[in-house]
Regions:
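Alpha-helical residues within the helix-turn-helix
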Residues: 37, 54-55
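A short, conserved structural fragment
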Residues: 58-62
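N-terminal helix-turn-helix DNA-binding core of bacterial DNA-binding proteins
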Residues: 2-42, 64-76
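Short, intrinsically disordered or compositionally biased N-terminal tails of bacterial proteins
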Residues: 1-4, 145-147
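Amphipathic alpha-helical dimerization/coiled-coil segments
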Residues: 77-147
Length: 147
């Protein structure tokens, strides 16, 4: 029962829930730099969020060179984790619309399926700024008459 309580505590935080929901939906691993950019959090906060999920057994970590990748562990059929994963996946996507957009942009920067861009890089700032500009409707100019 203690394990179940720890898992539910880990997901009671909105940022940890956002990361877990995204991992459950994208079915890919992410590195800390990608999590930082998607969440808009500092390296410290993103690492802490992922560490809490790992300690609760909700994600696994795999180091490859300078990158640490996080992904969901394979749940056992019928296990508490499998049921929890199904419940998390049932949360409507509109609750995470901004995170989904940012995640799609960030994962689109990968080369050969791997993260190659560090956190909060100029490349990320350019891509995310361009995407925000495209989404915002053009402001109408006010015409003022000088009499």
């Amino acid at each position: 029962m203690k394990d179940c309580v720890e898992v539910l505590k880990a997901l009671a935080d909105p940022n940890r829930l956002r990361v877990f929901w995204l991992l459950a939906r994208i079915d890919e691993r992410i590195c800390v730099a990608e999590a930082m950019d998607v969440l808009g959090e500092s390296h410290y906060n993103a690492s802490r969020i992922l560490k809490s999920l790992k300690q609760a057994g909700l994600v696994t970590a795999e180091r490859e060179g300078k990158w640490v990748f996080y992904s969901l562990p394979a749940p056992l059929a019928g296990s508490f984790h499998a049921h929890l994963l199904k419940a998390i996946q049932a949360i409507p996507a509109e609750n995470f619309s901004e995170e989904i957009k940012r995640c799609q942009l960030r994962l689109g920067m990968r080369e050969h399926g791997e993260c190659i861009v560090g956190a909060d890089s100029d490349a990320w700032r350019n891509v995310s700024t361009q995407a925000q500009t495209k989404r915002k409707p053009a402001a109408r100019k006010r015409h003022t008459e000088v009499v």
